[in-house]
C-alpha cells in the first residue's frame, strides 16, 4: 500500500464561495467556525485574494485587510493562503512594480503564509516581481500554471514554464484548472511531466466540479505524484466549486494514502456551513445553476467564479434569458483574442465582452477599456496572435506595446499616498485605493460615517403574504409622504405604472410602494418573487384619497390577501435613477448609454469641441470601465451624465450639435 501523505487546502473561505455565491460571504457569517477549522489539520486554508478583496470593498462593507487580520488571529496554527494575479495584484489591470512589491509586503505582514501567483496569459514576465518579493518577505511562493486547452497550449510549453518558475525561486508548482476542464489523463500527464522536470518541488492541483471531472482528475493527479489538492467542505462543494473535502479524504485513505485531517472537526464544519448554505439558498444568492454539472463547460471553458458572476450580471440587466447566447459567444471571443486562459482578469474581460456582443446585437460594437488595453499588449504576450481584423476594429491606429508593459509604468505608491492625505488611514488603504479607486473611496467615505448611508438604504424585500380575507376593510388615508420604486419588469406590457402594496408582489408591478419612513429615496436592490431588481426610489405626491380595496388576486397567482390599490403616481413623481432618453433638436446627435452601469467619469463639458472617437463618458459596468465615445465630430450641447449616477441602456448621456 502506498502511504504517501496527501495534503489538503480548504477553499470554503475563498474560491468555493466565490464560485457558488459570487464571493458574498461576509466575515460575521463564518467567524464562529474559524477556531474549529484551525484544528482540522489542513495544509493550508485559502482565505484571501481573488475576488474577495474587490467584493469586501464593493458589497460587504468590510475592510479586506482587517478581514485577513481577524482570520489570522482566529487561525494561528493553519497556514493562510491567498491568490495573487501577478502584475495585476488583485485588480483588473497591470500595476507598477513598486505597487506589486508593497502589496506582497503588506499581504505577508497582515497574515498570509502562502501566495499562489499566476498570470492570466501564463506570461512569466508578469510573475517575476511578485515571486521575487514573496521570497524576500519570507513567504511561500507557489508558481502557477493556468491550465487550459487550445490549439496553441501544449504539454511542452507547460513544462518549459515550470522550469522558468523554478529559476525564479518558487517553493511549489500549482496547476490551476479554473474551469474544471482538466480530465484525468490531462492531470496524470501534466503532473508526471512536472515531477520529471522538477522532482524537488511539491505539486498542487486545483480544479472545479463544473464538468463532473474533478474527482477522477484528482485521483489520477495524486497517482501521478501530486502532493496537495484543493477541496471544499461538503456544503460548499460541487457545482462550480471544488470537490468535497470529506469525500476525497475518505477515497484517498481507501487507496492507502495518508490523510491527516480530523474527521470529527470536518463534521462540525459541515454542520456549520449547512446553515450558511441554507441562508444563501433562501435569499437567492446561491443559484441552482451554479450547483449543476454542466458538460458544455468543456466547450465554453468558463470557470466557476466567472459563471456565477455572469449569471448575477445578466439578472441585474434583466437579461438572464440571454445566458445560453452569452455562453456560446464566449469561446468565439476567446479565439478572437488569441486563446487566453479564462481566469481573472481575462475571464471577466472575455465574459463581459461576450455579454456585450450579445446585448448590443453587433460584435465588438461596445468594447471596454480593459479589452482595448489587452489588444494593445498591456496585459502581456497572448498565447496566439489576436485576430487582426478584430484588433484593428478595437484599436484603430493605436500602436501596440513592445516588451513588458510594467517597465513603462512610473512608481505609484508614494505619489498616491501623498495625494490621498488623511483620506487613507494606512498604507493598506493606499493599496486598496490604487487597486480600486472609485470603490475604495466610496468605502472610505462610508466607513467614516459608520456605514450609515448603506444601513439606511438596506435592500427592501416584499412583506410576507397576509392571511386571505374575504372582504378586506379599506385602509385609512395616509397623510405622510409615499415612495414608489421603479421596477423594470419586462413581463408587464408597456411598463404600466401601478402602485401596489408589497404583499401583492405576484402582480409584477412597474411601481412598488416602498413605505413611509422619513427618507427611503435612493438606489436599492429589491426582490420580487425571488428575482432581484435594481431600483431607484423617488418621492411621490402625497395621496389625497383613501386607498380602495381591489379585486382579489387571480387564481393563477400565489395565495395572498386581496391587494389594496393606491393612487397612481403623478407623472411628476415618476422615479428616475439616471438621465432618461429625451428628444433632441433637429441637427443634434444624442449619445446614449450602451448598457446598464454607473457613471465613472465625465470627460466633456458643454461648449467643448469634440471629434469622432473622443471619449465623452466612462461607465463602470461588470467590473470594467466602458468608454462611451463621440460618434461624430461636433460640439457638446449638453451633458446629462453625472458621476456616481446609475444608468440603463439607452439613457441619454450627452447631446452633440
Model-identified regions with their sequence ranges:
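Conserved, mostly hydrophobic/aromatic
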Residues: 16, 117, 173, 225, ...
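Terminal or standalone catalytic/regulatory effector modules within metabolic enzymes
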Residues: 38-56, 291-297, 301-532, 536-547
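Hydrophobic faces of well-ordered beta-strands that scaffold small-molecule active sites
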Residues: 8-13, 43-47, 78-85, 115-116, ...
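Long, low-complexity intrinsically disordered segments that are proline/alanine-rich
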Residues: 465-475, 545-586
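Active-site beta->alpha loop and helix N-cap motifs at the rims of alpha/beta catalytic domains
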Residues: 49-161, 180-183
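Structured functional modules or segments
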Residues: 573-657
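Catalytic cores of alpha/beta
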Residues: 157-162, 211-224
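N-terminal amphipathic alpha-helix/helix-capping segment at the start of soluble metabolic enzymes
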Residues: 1-21, 68, 73
